[in-house]
Amino acid sequence: MKLQKPKGTQDILSVAAAKWQYVEGVARETFKQYHYGEIRTPMFEHYEVISRSVGDTTDIVTKEMYDFYDKGDRHITLRPEGTAPVVRSYVENKLFAPEVQKPVKLYYIGSMFRYERPQAGRLREFHQIGVECFGSANPATDVETIAMAYHLFERLGIKGVTLHLNSLGNAASRAAYRQALIDYLSPMRDTLSKDSQRRLDENPLRVLDSKEKEDKIAVANAPSILDYQDEESQAHFDAVRSMLEALAIPYVIDTNMVRGLDYYNHTIFEFITEVDQSELTICAGGRYDGLVEYFGGPATPGFGFGLGLERLLLILDKQGVELPVEEGLDVYIAVLGADANVAALALTQAIRRQGFTVERDYLGRKIKAQFKSADTFKAKVVITLGESEIKAGQAVLKHNQTRQEMTVSFDQIQTDFASIFAECVQ
């Protein structure tokens, strides 16, 4: 049997991994500017953590979760999204305590798992960057978090990003709209897809989010949720819009956007861009003021977003964005003969300890093959080390582009390689 990776997973090899590391690094730097700290939660959770928070009737829970019973007969699931585990951790670790400064701002980067049909930018194991902010009901928190995502996309060089915005209102306005939507959709129930017929009974707002053609036709003239906002909900949404305008962040109102998870209220949003004449969501999130309480904590407002790393990298590639990934070695050491093996090892370590990236030959190859490796690795400087160099206590350094050479002592290399390197590559 030929062993291969499971369907819907990927091996991220070193060249690609460098791009991942760059994007993750830019995200970390951006989040730090907004005073976010990293949190790392387990890759698996108790089933109830996800099912109760995400919603028993969502596609994630009914169709997409990897869940199983462990040897202790505990119902476990691989995490399909990041918010619920972070909220569970927030409550379990009592980050709501008065001595903890509010708002609590956290970000995460890690693997998520959903059993779905693999396609471009969508896998069964995928990677997500997300942020969660706890303790502020201020609409400025909504806008700051949206602005942080917008700032990240600007730094990465993504073009043509559009912010789609909607409000689900509070519990009262959402309940009023839910009934209005049921009244609107019920007469055309038979024209809906099978999934949306089920959603109409369980969670009618999810019909608005359907990608099926017949459902899109059915909801084309559906009542707008914004017409059912009470005074509190309207004031919150008006404040969000005015603050976005103050920051010159353009947006469009999308009243059919409801998000795929049940815990949202008030502001929800998506950032969308076009790739190959198709719209792709890069990032999505919103406000969830009841989730901490649902997990047994005190009533605590929350706001956050998540974005898929695979999809983000796909968009960067499709848009032709060149990521400034560092390539190549600083130094390649060509080793001539077994007698030079120990000296080469010592020299390699001495240069590395001074902050340089170094590789050497371990295979005892001819000098021509070693120089070819130096070219392949894009080494800036090549050091040739053989029996004569060891006897003299000196090494020959060559600029790998200009081919200019210089001879320096081992002592100089071991104590002040930075000066030698700068002189060699100037």
Swiss-Prot record:
Give one Pfam hit by family name.
Answer: tRNA-synt_His
The yes or no answer to whether the keyword Protein biosynthesis is present is yes
Cite the record's note on assembly.
Homodimer.
Does the record's keyword annotation contain Nucleotide-binding?
yes
Q: Which PANTHER family match?
A: HISTIDINE--TRNA LIGASE, MITOCHONDRIAL-RELATED, HISTIDYL-TRNA SYNTHETASE
Q: Where in the cell is it found?
A: Cytoplasm
In Gene Ontology terms, what is one molecular function of this protein?
catalytic activity, acting on a protein
EC number of this enzyme? 6.1.1.21
- The protein's gene is named hisS
The molecule here is called Histidine--tRNA ligase
Q: Domain of life, per the record?
A: Bacteria
Family to which the UniProt record says this protein belongs: Belongs to the class-II aminoacyl-tRNA synthetase family.
Which HAMAP family does the protein's record reference?
His_tRNA_synth
A single GO BP: histidyl-tRNA aminoacylation
